[in-house]
């Protein structure tokens, strides 16, 4: 195992400050927030982000998204004592879908509730007073993780609202995609 492989496997045990120091020294960890935003969150790299999102959302190669605009990553709290969100990358796709991509190196044991909170906060941020619910567009939250949330060998998981007895999907308005152990 080379030095680079050792760094990747050890990165999950570093503090956020240590990861930032490693990045400042020129050691790049591909799931570091700063590096990820630099690589995929800039106007001059929109094609990379579009290709990434299409590959993650449509693994069959259909590449349904044709364009997008970056959107505000900061979501304000919806009530006085509410919690705001600072997301990694947010985009409004050409079809109106909202896509959020998060990278996470460490399992802080709150990932599932935080993921659901981010997904629903982004979805509800579409609505303005007086708007029609039929104007809501689908929201997709993609989480690239350097750890495993679930047992087993599956690394890609898709979650949607569905009937727990039949598995019938209610709608695809809220989709959470999880890609695990991407080191």
Q: What do these predicted regions represent?
A:
Residues 1-183:
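Elongated, amphipathic alpha-helical interaction scaffolds
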């Amino acid at each position: 195992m080379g030095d680079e492989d050792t760094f990747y496997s050890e990165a999950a045990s570093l503090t956020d400050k240590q990861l930032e120091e490693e990045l400042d020294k020129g050691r790049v960890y591909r799931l570091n927030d700063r590096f990820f935003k630099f690589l995929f969150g800039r106007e001059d790299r929109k094609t990379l982000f579009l290709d990434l999102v299409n590959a993650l959302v449509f693994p069959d190669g259909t590449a349904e998204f044709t364009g997008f605009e970056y959107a505000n990553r900061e979501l304000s709290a919806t009530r006085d004592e509410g919690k705001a969100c600072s997301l990694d990358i947010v985009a409004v796709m050409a079809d109106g879908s909202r896509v959020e991509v998060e990278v996470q190196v460490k399992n802080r044991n709150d990932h599932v509730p935080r993921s659901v909170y981010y997904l629903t906060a982004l979805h509800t941020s579409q609505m303005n007073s007086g708007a029609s619910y039929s104007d809501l567009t689908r929201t997709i939250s993609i989480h690239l993780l350097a750890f495993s949330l679930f047992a087993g060998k599956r690394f890609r998981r898709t979650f949607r609202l569905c009937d727990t007895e039949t598995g019938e999907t209610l709608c695809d308005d809220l989709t959470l995609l999880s890609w695990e152990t991407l080191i």
